Amino acid sequence: METEVKKIPYLDLKAINEPYEKEIKDAINKVVNSGWYLQGEAVKKFEKSYAQFIGTEYCISCANGTDALKLMLMGELAIGNLQKGDEVIVPANTYFATVLAISSVELTPVLVDANIDTLQIDDRLIEDKISPKTKAIMIVHLYGKLAWTPKIAEICKKHHLLLFEDNAQGFGCSTTLSDDSQNTSEPLSKRRYTGNLSDAAAHSFYPSKNLGALGDAGAVTTNNKDLAEAIMALHEYGKIEDGIFRYQGVNSRMDEIQAAVLNVKLQYPENEQKARHRQIQLYLEHLDDDIKDRCIAAKLISPAHENVFHVFPFLTRKRDQLKGFLAENGVGTKIHYFRPPYLQPCYPEMNHLEFPVAKRIADEELSLPCNSSLNDEDIIRVSKLINQFLV
C-alpha cells in the first residue's frame, strides 16, 4: 500500500490564523455584541495603531487596497497637487490594480521596466520617462521587497515630483535612511517602514497578505494633513460634515469586524516575518548552488529587513513544467503575474510596448510556498523536488 504524500499548499489561511483564533473570535464577538458595525471603536483603534506602527501622522482606513490606491490619488487631485491628465510613473511588472487605480481617476500611467537583480522598478530608467506632464512616481514594494532607493528620492526632489508607495505587499518591510534625500523636508537617521517613505502610501489587508484581515480591507498612510483630511472626506462620499459634501467621493469604509481582526494580528507583527525569513534561509541551504544562481534574483535576499517575502519569486524558463511537477508531488505554487498590465486587453494603447525584463518575469516567475503555516520539513522537501527537476 502506497504512503500518501503530504500535500504542501501554497497558502493555508486557516492555519495561518489559528494562533490568533481565540483572540479573533473574542474580538468579533465584542463587535457583534456592541451593535456598532461601521465607523466604531475598532476602526478608530486600528487607524491609530497602524499609523503608530508605520510611523506616520495619519492613517485612513478603507474597504480594500485598490480603493486605497485610488483614494490616495483622488486626495491629491482634490487638494490640487495633481490635475487630470498628469502622468504617474509606475513599474511595468506590477499587479494590475496599481495601474488601474491611476487610469481610473483620469491620470496617465507611464510604465518603466524592472531591474532583474531586484525585480523592482529600475531607477536607472526613470528619468528617460519624465516629461513636462510627469507629476509623480508610484513605487511598488512587489513581493515584499523594498522598492524605495535613494536615487528615486533624488529624482523626485530634482524634478519636483510626488512620491507614492503601493505597499499592498510590503507590510513590515523597512530600510535604514541616513540622509535627507526622502521627498519630504524631514532629515532621516533611523530605520523607517514602507508606508512612511513617501508623500502617501496605500496598504492592502487582503486575507493572504502578511497582515491579513478575514475579508477585504485597506488604508492610506501619510504625514500630509491636507491630504489626510481630503481622503477622510472622499472615502465617505465626500462628506465633510453631516449633510455637507465637498467632493464627489466614494463609499469605501473598513468595517468593524475587519478592524477588530487586524487589531489582534497587529499585536504580533514579527510572527509571519520571522517564519518567512527562516524558510528563505532553508531554501538557500537546500537548493543546489547553481539553481540558486540561475533562479533567485541577485539582490532579492539581503539585507533581511528590506524583504518580508510576501512572495518568494523563483525564476526559471521551465516555469510551467516545474509548476506541474510540483503539483504532481502535492506542492502548491502560484504565478505573480503571468500577464503584466501593459499586455492586458483593457489597455490596447499599451499592448505594443516592450519591457523585456517585465516580460521575462511574467514568463518565468513561480511563487514558492513560504509562510507560517509550513514547517522546516515542508521547505526542505520542496527544495529537494526543485533540485530533482532542474538538475
What are these regions (language model features)?
Residues 3, 14, 26, 43-48, ...:
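PLP-dependent aminotransferase class I/II
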Residues 11-16, 25-45:
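A glycine-/small-polar-enriched, mobile loop at the entrance of the PLP active site in fold-type I
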Residues 36, 40-87, 100-105, 111-113:
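Phosphate-binding glycine-rich loop
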Residues 93-99:
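Conserved coil-to-alpha-helix start sites within the AMP-binding
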Residues 105, 158-159, 329:
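Helix C-cap/helix->beta junction micro-motif
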Residues 108-118, 334:
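Short beta-strand->loop structural element characteristic of the AMP-binding/adenylate-forming
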